[in-house]
UniProtKB/Swiss-Prot annotation:
Belongs to the bacterial ribosomal protein bL17 family. This is Large ribosomal subunit protein bL17. GO terms for molecular function: structural constituent of ribosome. It comes from the Bacteria. GO terms for biological process: translation. GO terms for cellular component: cytosolic large ribosomal subunit. Signal peptide: none annotated. SUPFAM superfamilies: Prokaryotic ribosomal protein L17 (SSF64263). The gene is rplQ. PANTHER family: LARGE RIBOSOMAL SUBUNIT PROTEIN BL17M (PTHR14413:SF16), RIBOSOMAL PROTEIN L17 (PTHR14413). It comes from Ruminiclostridium cellulolyticum (strain ATCC 35319 / DSM 5812 / JCM 6584 / H10). Pfam families: Ribosomal_L17.
Length: 174
C-alpha cells in the first residue's frame, strides 16, 4: 500500500493540487475540497506547522549597514549635480548610510524555511502584493499553536457533491 493517496492523477498534477490546497489553507485558514484531498493536505499542513513551531525562535539579530537614497517630503529622490573630467554635467543620487537590526535564520531554521517553501506557492493579493507564506507560518501561525502538540487542523463533513457524489469536507485551522 502506498504511503500517500494517488488521487487519480499523475505525480506532477497531484503535487500541484496539494501545493495549491496547502497554500490556500495557510492563506485563508479554511478550504472546501474532497475528503481524500483534505486528508492528504491535513498531513502536509500538520507537519509544516510542527516544523515551524520547532524553529520559530531559532534566529539571531545582527546590525547591518544599509545604504538608501535620500528622499524629500514628496517621496522623490534627491539628486546632486556633478561635473565629469570632460566638463559634462550629470546627476548623482544622494545616499545616506545607516545601520539596521536584521534577523538572520540559523541553519536549522533556514532548512525548515526551505522545506516549507517546497510545499507552498507564493500567492499574491488583489493589489498584486506577494504574500510570504513561510513568514506567516513562523510569525503568526506557529506562535498560535506553540503550546499544542498536534491537532492543528480539523475536518467537517459536508455531504456528497452534486454531480459525482464525491464526499465534500471543510478543512480548517483550529
Amino acid at each position: 500500500m502506498p504511503g500517500q493517496r494517488k488521487l487519480g492523477r499523475a505525480t506532477d498534477q497531484r503535487k500541484a493540487i496539494l501545493k495549491n490546497l496547502t497554500t490556500a489553507l495557510f492563506v485563508s485558514g479554511r478550504i472546501e475540497t474532497t475528503e481524500a484531498r483534505a486528508k492528504e493536505v491535513k498531513n502536509i499542513a500538520e507537519k509544516l506547522i510542527t516544523l515551524a513551531i520547532k524553529e520559530a525562535d531559532n534566529f539571531t539579530s545582527k546590525q547591518v549597514k544599509v545604504s538608501a537614497a535620500k528622499v524629500d517630503s514628496k517621496g522623490k529622490k534627491l539628486t546632486d549635480t556633478k561635473t565629469s573630467k570632460n566638463g559634462k554635467k550629470y546627476f548623482v543620487v544622494e545616499r545616506e548610510q545607516k545601520t539596521d537590526m536584521v534577523s538572520v535564520d540559523n541553519a536549522s531554521r533556514l532548512h525548515a524555511r526551505r522545506l516549507i517553501m517546497n510545499w507552498v506557492y507564493r500567492p499574491t493579493t488583489a493589489d498584486g502584493k506577494n504574500i510570504n507564506i513561510t513568514d506567516k507560518l513562523f510569525d503568526e501561525i506557529a506562535p498560535k499553536y506553540k503550546d499544542k502538540k498536534g491537532g492543528y487542523t480539523r475536518i467537517y463533513k459536508l455531504g456528497p457533491r452534486r454531480g459525482d457524489a464525491a464526499e465534500m469536507v471543510i478543512l480548517e485551522l483550529v
